[in-house]
Amino acid sequence: MKLINAYTDGSCLGNPGPGGWAVLLRYKNNEKELVGGELDTTNNRMELMAAIMALERLSEPCQIKLHTDSQYVRQGITEWMSGWVRRGWKTAAGDPVKNRDLWERLCAATQRHMIEWCWVKAHNGDSDNERVDVLARGQAMAQRSTVASR
């Protein structure tokens, strides 16, 4: 099973507003960057999209170290998800889970991989985290430019 390092980040200008996500996939000496964005979104949706795209892009089952600066993503998938599912996609307070569509997609994307979810402190000198931060912010700015030119 291939060992992949994945670095993910999401960015949103305004929250809600234009947003972007970015992924850096690394296998041995090979790297692949993935980016995308949406016109009207939130930072949490972009963080989720980055993780989803990292996992969905891999064509075979892999062992993955997924690095994210989002506690929302890391805690959601490792701590909260099982309770949400058990409660019919309700939080402990009984409210509907926000971003359920993306959480379900992320859950499905995890099924064929062995994943270690690693939290990285944002803006703290991790060069790969900084790299995806710049890419995600660039995608958010590109989305904002698209809105401004309409």
UniProtKB/Swiss-Prot annotation:
Cofactor(s) annotated in UniProt: Mg(2+)
Protein family according to the UniProt entry: Belongs to the RNase H family.
Signal sequence segment: none
Subcellular location field: Cytoplasm
Physiological role: Endonuclease that specifically degrades the RNA of RNA-DNA hybrids.
GO biological process: DNA replication, removal of RNA primer
Protein name, per record: Ribonuclease HI
Main location, first listed in the record: cytoplasm
Annotated positions binding Mg(2+) 1: D9, E47, D69
Quaternary state and interactors: Monomer.
One annotated Gene Ontology cellular component of this protein: cytoplasm
Keyword Phosphoprotein: no
GO MF annotation list: magnesium ion binding; nucleic acid binding; RNA-DNA hybrid ribonuclease activity
Gene name linked to the record: rnhA
Lineage: Bacteria, Pseudomonadati, Pseudomonadota, Gammaproteobacteria, Lysobacterales
EC number: 3.1.26.4
Catalyzed reactions per annotation: Endonucleolytic cleavage to 5'-phosphomonoester
